[in-house]
Amino acid sequence: MKEVLQQFKQNYLIKYWNPVAAVIAAGLISAYYFGVTGTYWAVTGEFTRWGGHALQALGVDVSDWSYYKIIGMQGTIFTRIDGVMILGMFAGCISAALWANNVKWRNQPHKRRIVQALIGGALAGFGARLAMGCNLASLFTGIPQFSVHAWFFTIATAVGTYAGVKVTLLPIFRVKLELKKGAAKLQETDPKQANRRFWIGMVVFFAYLIASLYVMTNSIKLGFAMLCGLAFGLLIERAQICFTSAFRDLWVTGRAYMAKAIIFGIIVGTLGVFSYIQLGVPAKIMWAGPNAIIGGLLFGFGIVLAGGCETGWMYRSMEGQVHFMWVGLGNVIGSTYLAYAWDDLAPVLALDYEKLNLLKSFGPVGGLLVNYGLLILCLIAVVWWERHFLKKAKAKIAAANSSQACGC
């Protein structure tokens, strides 16, 4: 029995999980999350509220800011669905990282990288809230809502990440590597420390799990949000789910593994969300205007500049990577600034444009088919790009080898 438990611990709590299975699971859970809570899996809206609360603590009156009237400032992080869900994500991330002994304080020695993290995080936060959602609400959980704005945002994000890759490869963003004499010594794992951390992770996990179940006895929505947040946190940390790497890998190495996983997750989530919409849960539809396109461009560029998206910085910061704590701070700053600038930007970029719903434009069955058709086109495009990129890379290697062989 002990051997079986040890094998389970090694295979499922310490080793990384298969990203495809994890993202599909996230898509399925996000559909249930929508059905029970009436909202989608999203994080930057709550980050914007955190910024609003911080300003209020400093004496700034944000009660007449239109953006906060749209997203709502009622309650606290402990009484809002988004708030307790995000707390659950952090609890899940730290639990999973502790199980695998993957927690280590890793400071950022280069000031240039800190500036990148702050600016990139701020651009991503600003862009996400301009588009009314980040890689979750305007992509992973936005597309299953059948909102056209999510498609605008997704395409713009892809373009933004491509531009971000080109810019971050410039010499100005490179840091000098310091070479030290002698072979580097690998730090040995302390079995006692690893075991201690594993049980601390278990305490955090079960404490939040029990709290979730207790809250469910009084509020199904809040308790279920806590439970889903815990699951989301486990999934993104153990499978290292990062939308930045999904896009960046396409442009840098041609690898499409994570991008394909995300598409599969959306395909699964779409059917679940569609079912709940047909049962009467209202879809979350946002303005399909320039705000979604500009927001996507800024978000895509920002996450590459920063090195991580919203889900990425959350789990990496829980692993002790200080760089991503700066990214998170930048996110809050950028999203809060968008709330401040919304009244000037919204009339031109958002409010004069329709909230387009594929289910209303094409009917329930037609909208579902259009959404799936677009997802299949995305999958075909990603597979084609992967093969095209790798074919070009192999041709370059073959040409280089040929030149060396002939002495050119």
Where are these regions (language model features)?
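Membrane-interfacial helix-loop segments of redox and metal-homeostasis proteins
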Residues: 1-408
